[in-house]
Structure formats: structure tokens, C-alpha cells
């Protein structure tokens, strides 16, 4: 346990919302979890599906919620800055994984960011996804806070970012592939949290 006023090496090489080296400006909360089921750990899939991840115990979520509430209030941390290791280092980290209940933290404890379902549905109904360029989609990811390259292709690093976003906001559909639902969620988040 590192005192809150001291630096720890929990994030490693990382970035979010234009900041890098987040060890200097963040507080990490480590949650003990096996993450991926033992019988699925040898899968060669870089993007494990939702059912490969293990559930968290309710007491873990209750305790982590208490810690986050305390730290966020003490340091006035905006909802959008409550993120996962996978959000800040998508090519290296997958924790806390697909079964970490971000939506529950938002709804039950008022922690973190979450999208409005009505906005998501509205963006899904617009049917503009297929006409949206890769560079425009990547710009939406950057707008939310993710560091992503400016290539006009879905290379491995870009898919890592999409997978990290999906782990956080669309975990049952976490594949690393950008799709209509994931894009609609991203647009809904950028509408709700414009800065």
C-alpha cells in the first residue's frame, strides 16, 4: 500500500486524455482477481470474449466503490477520469476485464462515466456508421481520451484500443472490432462528456 501522496509504479507506460506517464498524476486501485478462467488462459485469442473472464465477488465491488468514492471526493476526480488499466495502456493491460461492473458502479454508486441509452439508440438509428471513415472513428476515440494512432487502418494497436473501450463500455461485445453498437456508445459518451 502506497500513501496517496506518493508515486507508485502501477500504470507503467500509459496515457489518457492527453496525459502520459500516468504514474505521476493518478491513483491506482489494484483488485485481486484471477481475471480469465484458468482453462481459457492458453487461448491464443488476443481479445478474450466476455465468457472467458471471471466474475468479481460482490464484496469486492462494494469495497472498491467505497475506496473510489473516497479518493474521487478527496481529489475532485471527474467521472471521465475514473478508468481501467486497459483504458490507459490498451496494448499491455486487460484489467480489470470484461466482468468488472462499470455500469453498476455508475448506477448504484454514482462512480465513473456511462452513456445515456437513449443517445446510444439515437446514434444507432442514424445509420451513419458504414459511411464513417476510420480516421473519423479514431478521432472520436481520441476525443473521449484514448491515445490511438492516426493510420487509416485497423491495425493491432488500434484494435487494442477498441477492445479496451469495449471492455469498459460494451463488454459482452468485446472483440477488438469496431461495430455499430460500439460506435454509437462512443458517440453517446462524447455527447454526454464533451470535455
Q: Where do the protein language model's features map onto the residues?
A:
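Short, well-ordered, mixed-charge alpha-helical segments that flank or form enzyme active sites
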Residues: 36-38, 90-93
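Acidic, His- and aromatic-enriched active-site or binding-groove loops in soluble protein domains
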Residues: 98-124
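A charge-rich, low-complexity, intrinsically flexible signal that marks solvent-exposed coils, linkers
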Residues: 21, 93-102
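Acidic/histidine-rich, metal-coordinating catalytic segments
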Residues: 77-92
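Short acidic, glycine/serine/threonine-rich helix-capping segments at coil-helix boundaries
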Residues: 125-195
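Second-shell loop/turn segments in exported
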Residues: 15-16, 47-59, 91-92, 123-130, ...
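Sec/Tat-exported extracytoplasmic proteins
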Residues: 2, 20, 33-35, 68-75, ...
Amino acid at each position: 500500500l502506497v500513501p496517496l501522496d506518493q508515486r507508485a509504479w502501477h500504470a507503467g507506460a500509459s496515457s489518457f486524455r492527453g496525459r502520459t506517464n500516468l504514474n505521476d498524476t493518478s491513483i491506482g486501485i489494484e483488485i485481486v482477481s484471477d481475471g480469465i478462467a484458468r482453462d481459457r488462459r492458453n487461448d491464443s485469442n488476443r481479445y478474450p470474449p466476455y465468457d472467458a473472464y471471471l466474475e468479481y465477488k460482490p464484496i469486492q465491488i462494494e469495497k472498491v466503490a467505497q475506496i473510489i468514492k473516497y479518493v474521487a471526493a478527496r481529489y475532485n476526480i471527474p467521472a471521465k477520469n475514473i478508468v481501467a488499466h486497459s483504458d490507459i495502456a490498451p496494448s499491455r493491460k486487460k484489467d480489470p476485464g470484461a466482468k468488472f461492473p462499470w455500469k453498476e458502479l455508475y448506477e448504484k454508486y454514482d462512480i465513473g462515466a456511462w452513456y445515456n441509452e437513449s443517445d446510444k439508440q439515437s446514434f444507432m438509428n442514424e445509420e451513419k456508421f458504414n459511411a464513417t471513415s476510420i480516421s473519423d472513428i479514431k478521432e472520436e476515440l481520441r476525443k473521449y481520451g484514448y491515445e490511438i494512432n492516426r493510420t487509416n487502418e485497423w491495425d493491432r494497436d488500434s484494435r487494442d484500443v477498441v477492445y479496451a473501450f469495449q471492455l469498459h463500455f460494451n463488454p459482452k461485445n468485446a472483440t477488438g472490432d469496431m461495430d455499430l453498437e460500439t460506435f454509437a456508445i462512443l458517440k453517446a459518451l462524447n455527447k454526454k462528456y464533451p470535455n
